Amino acid sequence: MDPDRSTHLGIWRDEYDKFTKPFFDWNIPDLSEEIRDAINVGLREDMEGMNLENLRDLLEPDYLPLENGFAICPNGELSIAIKTSWPDTTPEMIDWWFGWHIISTERYKLWHPQAHLFAQPRYDLSNESGLTDRERYIGNTSWVDEYIGTLQSRLAITFHDPSDIGLDTDSLDNANYGTVICATTGSSDDESGTQKGRLIHAVRRTGKGCEMRSRFILPTGTPNFLGPFLINHCYTEMTHLAGFLPRLYEFVKTTDFS
């Protein structure tokens, strides 16, 4: 990966391909009233944030007190929660997306056209046959450049199995979860490879598709202003993706590109 890489927003005319041209849309969804309220409230001092110690609370059937907002955990970590709706989407489509988009900057830009700049995987497994969608991203690292709020960030996101943080398959099945995307996060410029942040996107089936309950757990001392930035960013990219993922999935799966 070139540390002096040049990046830009959007997909330029000569960068489009057969996948990205039909689905790239610069326009992004407005924030919902619930998300605006969560941002305006600011740091929730009336409750504690979720971290790995109480992550299994997500397995409870009811919603938790904090589904949209941010709070400090007992150990000082900053915990950020966002819930998004995915109508007509299956958990299998979301697993497919994480294995499919990881190989290409242009595919990554479909997700949040006004914030995503660059993506490169540690391993390009797109031509490896016999892999499941989950095997295409679990164990892999995605190096991404993106705006989070006004901050231009260069991140390393390393995906791992949910069982590594206590979310075993049987428990997830019993709680009606179809998949959980888990990763550790750090700076792609950190040559030591230190990754102290965590992200969890828990995808639960609903009668109309599924819902994603996202949690970001960031180290003690993380500035509180990252709370509103990440709520805005995550809600926008996930809601934008939910708007076209079923069509993209069908297009890629059923079109003969030979």
Identify the function of each model-found stretch.
Residues 1-26:
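Intrinsically disordered, low-structural-confidence terminal and linker regions
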Residues 2, 18, 38-132:
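Hydrophobic ligand-binding cavity/cleft-lining segments
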Residues 4-7, 174-235:
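Beta-strand/loop substructures that line and gate deep hydrophobic ligand-binding cavities in soluble
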Residues 23, 27-30, 47-50:
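Charged, glycine/proline-rich intrinsically disordered loops and linkers
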Residues 37, 218-258:
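A conserved amphipathic terminal alpha-helix motif
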Residues 65-72, 83, 162-169, 200-204:
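Short amphipathic beta-strand and strand-loop transition segments with alternating hydrophobic
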Residues 70-76, 123, 170-177, 205-207:
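Short, ordered beta-strand-loop transition motifs
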Residues 116-192:
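Glycine-rich portal/gate segments that line the openings of hydrophobic small-molecule binding cavities
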